[in-house]
Amino acid sequence: MIQPQSYLTAADNSGARKLMCIRVLGGGNRRYARIGDVIVAVVKDGIPNIPIKKSDTVKAVIVRTRKELKRDNGMNICFDDNAAVIINADGNPRGTRVFGPVARELRDKNFTKIISLAPEVL
């Protein structure tokens, strides 16, 4: 569960390393975001000489959370870190690679481009 002021790692090669959530999108006053939700984040740490710089405001989709996710078949899935992929206004990732596993629930939310770039889908 991601809420404002939560730190995440960037799971792509867009140039950001650390992100901080500042808003959960979707609904008036949503408190938490889960896998597949879109957030507004600020870049706290980045790679030099890349278009995405520190203190830039970006939209990102959450691909991994430490909080377990209950599936309909009764299985619980959780990851070692909280991670997000930076997206543009169309919902496509700004980077060209995605690092680490991502959850299958992204396919239900129409983030198929992220699914195709990921090395492993759980």
Swiss-Prot record:
Example of a GO biological process term: translation
Keywords, alphabetical: Cyanelle, Plastid, Ribonucleoprotein, Ribosomal protein, RNA-binding, rRNA-binding
Top-level taxon: Eukaryota
Signal peptide residue numbers: none
A single GO cellular-component term on record: cytosolic large ribosomal subunit
Molecular-function GO term, any one: large ribosomal subunit rRNA binding
SUPFAM superfamilies attached to this UniProt entry: Ribosomal protein L14
Localization per record: Plastid, Cyanelle
InterPro entries xrefs: Ribosomal_uL14, Ribosomal_uL14_bac-type, Ribosomal_uL14_CS, Ribosomal_uL14_sf
The keyword Plastid belongs to this UniProt entry's keyword annotation: yes
Free-text function comment from the UniProt entry: Binds to 23S rRNA.
Family classification: Belongs to the universal ribosomal protein uL14 family.
Subunit structure: Part of the 50S ribosomal subunit.
The name this protein goes by in its record: Large ribosomal subunit protein uL14c
Organism, scientific name: Cyanophora paradoxa
Species lineage: Eukaryota, Glaucocystophyceae, Cyanophoraceae, Cyanophora
